[in-house]
Amino acid sequence: MLESRLAKNIARIVQARKPYLISYHVRASTQNALLKQTVLQSSSFKSFPTLPRLAARNISNSGILSRTTPVIIKQISMVRSYSSGDVENPEILNKNESNQSSGVKRAMPFRVLKKMKSFLFKQNKPLTVDNVTAFFSWWLVSHIVWIVVGTTTFFSLLLYTLNTVSAQELLGRWIGQLMTKNTGFQFVFESAIVPNWRKGLITFNKISVIRRPDTLNGIGAQNPNNKSDYEKEYMALRKRYDSNEEPDTEALSQGNYTQFELSIDKADVSFSFARFLNGKGIVKELQLKGVRGVVDRRFIEWDPSSDPRDYRRKHNWGDFEIEKFKLEDLRVTLLQPKGFRKFPVSVFFCELPRLRKQWLFYDLMNAKTLTGSFDNSMFTIHRLQLRPYSPYLKVGKQLDDMRHSRLRIDNVAIDHLNRGVSGAFGWINDGSVDFLVNISFPSEPSENSFQKAWISLMDKLKKKEKDEDVYKDVHFDVNVQLHNPKAVIPIFTNQVSYINNALIRPIIAYINSTRTFIPILCHVSKPLSDFDGSWTFYDSGVLQEISAQVYESFARDVLNQEIRRKRIQKVGYWSLRRFLHLVLVSLQELAPTTSSISNFE
């Protein structure tokens, strides 16, 4: 009777296809105690056609079942009990419920894993080696693609995870040691390194960059992250350089290279692993704010007779090529060699479309916006919307495609130009100079474009025509205005070996005689290859070309002045002759009248 009733309920359960918990409680008629409990969970009973067979499989040493054995079928949300006449024991029910709930909790992770397995592999079969290797390969390739494509996002999540587990100091020390080892400069990251999700950048706060002999020899790099002392040094450094006090540079040791000690308030960086694989550096975008410090060049020595082209650097794999660079609020004190006075250099705002280590000077001249001061002299570099007029370049389609910028420097002291430079600037020892330079850059196709690849291929296949070579040059239309200049004759003649010594005295006399204002117009053309590896006006050869053009302009002015003087003399002689001729004619006209009057008397 009981088996038939249970069979009907089992059939109903199978049709509903709901998971049930079935508990069998067997009580011996002799001892009235619980002998065995088995909990089974299943959604189908097709493998167990009859309950006696099910009980026989799950209960060992069962013996003869009593007719008073209660059999309880429980669903997760409800309880159904069937009995042959005895009243159910409430203690057994409560115990069963607690055991079943704990069993469900323990089974939850297995359910989740089973669902993940079904979602990933689309099957319920046991995992094989092929499944595991395929899953691992998919996981590895996806992470590699993520690192290459979204490098900044990957590092942002990594830094965010490390910051959340209170590893900021360890992370800053590790990054500082890594950059110190790769660059030779001592880096200190005092504050937290956090991702900027809105801008897609990683923010570094309170950075110190130092290049001194002890850091290059590895002495200062052994303990570069002393957090307890760095905060005091950082605040003292900013306070000292924000004020008008003189910087303390006694600790700087001697070395034939540029030494510096800089503090950066904030740096926003984005990375690109794909650019790193191409040898362009891992940094894709860089924004700096609040730079203070000292740049010491007092111990640099060079041979004046050497060629400036020897100082150009060679390209190395891994040199940075930043796609976007911004700089705000920079103020450093520059110390020059040979006892030259120290002076401040400030940059208020700078935005560059790209900044390459190999083309540093060229990219600075090609800036979108650059404003600042050099020894309290304002300077600006900005793009021109319209093409400026130039009498040295022909109007054409290729000229219209060139990019034009303007460099303007007001009231620069002449001692910045006459140090180590031969020519007219080397003769002037007093005064100030205003520069207005219109720079024309050759057009360049965008990076990774088909046009650039096609032009490069055509340049290799055929030779460029001569009339097109002018558009591969960088052109400078220079307008120099000298205010209150004073020149002296050079002592050594080897400084003026490239000019005629006979013109030195007339030029110096012309400069000293015109002390109020002297305008100079000249044009300089430099091949684009001269800026490959150049970092300054000196090693690019622009300063030497401008000095030579200024001399030629002075020579033309002196020649024109001499021509004007001779012309004035000729005009004066002609005027004097005409005046004397008129006097003689007048005397001749008066002579007959005088003789007639005397005869009448």
Curated annotation (Swiss-Prot):
GO terms for cellular component: mitochondrial inner membrane; mitochondrion. Residues 156-601 are mitochondrial intermembrane. One of its GO terms (biological process) is mitochondrion organization. Residues 1-66 form a transit peptide. InterPro entries: Mdm31/Mdm32. It is found in: Mitochondrion inner membrane. It comes from the Eukaryota. Pfam families: MDM31_MDM32. The chain crosses the membrane at residues 135-155. Residues 67-134 are mitochondrial matrix. Keywords: Membrane, Mitochondrion, Mitochondrion inner membrane, Transit peptide, Transmembrane, Transmembrane helix. It is a single-pass membrane protein. Involved in the organization of the mitochondrial membranes and the global structure of the mitochondria. Also required for mitochondrial distribution and mobility as well as for the maintenance of mitochondrial DNA nucleoids structures. Belongs to the MDM31/MDM32 family. This is Mitochondrial distribution and morphology protein 31. The lineage of its organism: Eukaryota, Fungi, Dikarya, Ascomycota, Taphrinomycotina.
